[in-house]
């Protein structure tokens, strides 16, 4: 799945609200988590702690840094450093990912100005409408995007395209997407890779049309991913699990027969579980009645929670059963790219009682000012909507600790991340836990044949939300968490 861009220096969220390189003066700087840097250095004595870093608030975790001496090319959309030819034109990773998500999710944006906003590295996130408009005007080819939403274009040789102003207007208004949907619905959906298959999830509950289309794209991607693997010959080291390649034969109307879990599947899941720290979070979250929590205090608490959760992910890496199979460089690269997703996944599952219980009680004692409410960005509103939807999905599924451990490993072993030295080995490890998770869910939840794809479809959503949260200005995070936690806790109590 495509990863979202990191926020540009000084860039803000949507809706024209300004972003910050550091917390504003009203907020205390987050606590440094230098211990995380030391912990990662311990993974390989040869590093001597000499690593570049990516900030978490003001803390650091190691990350590989591209060579500045590489040839500099400019993105035709925003002027940032280009990384290659993407969908027909030279562009950066950020605009590439933005264009792909906009087309795959059939997004329809609005411009609050005159539809001529400046596109630059610092301002590209302020107006999604004008950003997509410039992508189309500069010749980005939406037909080069794979219809299943998976990485890799359909035809890398396709160059920029020239389309009429009328067609651009149809795309920007969403009319083009509606016409395509009607076309495919009238021509059947026998091909998993066709857009018509996306209509199959239209009757699923979702908080809005954007989430519904996103869910259908993810299901289509899941089907293509599954078919790719199921059509392959079974590798020798996977043949010990005979049930793994029978998923395509399952019918929602005819649950599979009960069977036993393969001993080696059980063993690998047990090893994953042994790596997990399921003890309650140690960060104090209890506040006396009647105390009014300030924005600065809530922000500091969120930073301490993020520090503890990040520390647990680093400790988890060192206990993984495949720890010796990958290089330290790859582990550093993987953690730098997925730490937000790992924290979000754990917060929605194994630590959800504390996050949506104790932390929700703290956020309830925080009252945002009128200015904070007025300045809240559209980007933050989208994150809120998707987080609430994802919370209810996890609450409905009641994800077990074993499923959580498998999902976490699958998400972490993302071979599409740039800078990896062992992508093929990562792919094999990813498949291993993909199959084991499928084996476990089919064994334990015999009468829920759709459970495994439902679990897997949560992972792209987590990646998308984690990427979007990076673009939310820091001073808006206390309000964001207050709204999400209040909504989720209130709806759960009503149930």
UniProtKB/Swiss-Prot annotation:
Residues 9-18 have a biased composition (Gly residues). Residues 180-192 have a biased composition (Basic and acidic residues). Residues 202-214 have a biased composition (Low complexity). Residues 72-147 bind DNA. GO terms for molecular function: DNA-binding transcription activator activity, RNA polymerase II-specific; DNA-binding transcription repressor activity; protein homodimerization activity; RNA polymerase II cis-regulatory region sequence-specific DNA binding; sequence-specific DNA binding; zinc ion binding. One of its GO terms (cellular component) is transcription regulator complex. A zinc finger (NR C4-type) spans 75-95, 111-135. Residues 264-495 form the NR LBD domain. Keywords: Developmental protein, Differentiation, DNA-binding, Metal-binding, Nucleus, Receptor, Spermatogenesis, Transcription, Transcription regulation, Zinc, Zinc-finger. Zn(2+) 1 binds at residues 75, 78, 92, 95. Zn(2+) 2 binds at residues 111, 117, 127, 130. Residues 187-268 are annotated as: Sufficient for interaction with UIMC1. GO terms for biological process: cell differentiation; gamete generation; negative regulation of transcription by RNA polymerase II; positive regulation of mesenchymal stem cell differentiation; positive regulation of transcription by RNA polymerase II; spermatogenesis. Expressed in the germ cells of both the adult testis and ovary, being most abundant in spermatids. Residues 1-34, 145-165, 177-214 are annotated as: Disordered. InterPro entries: NHR-like_dom_sf, Nucl_hrmn_rcpt_lig-bd, Nuclear_hormone_rcpt_NR3, Nuclear_hrmn_rcpt, Znf_hrmn_rcpt, Znf_NHR/GATA. It is found in: Nucleus. Belongs to the nuclear hormone receptor family. NR6 subfamily. Orphan nuclear receptor that binds to a response element containing the sequence 5'-TCAAGGTCA-3'. Acts as a regulator of embryonic stem cell pluripotency by mediating repression of POU5F1/OCT4: binds to the DR0 element within the POU5F1/OCT4 promoter and inhibits POU5F1/OCT4 expression during embryonic stem cell differentiation. Required to restrict POU5F1/OCT4 expression to the germ cell lineage. Involved in the regulation of gene expression in germ cell development during gametogenesis. Homodimer. Interacts with UIMC1. This is Nuclear receptor subfamily 6 group A member 1. The lineage of its organism: Eukaryota, Metazoa, Chordata, Craniata, Vertebrata.
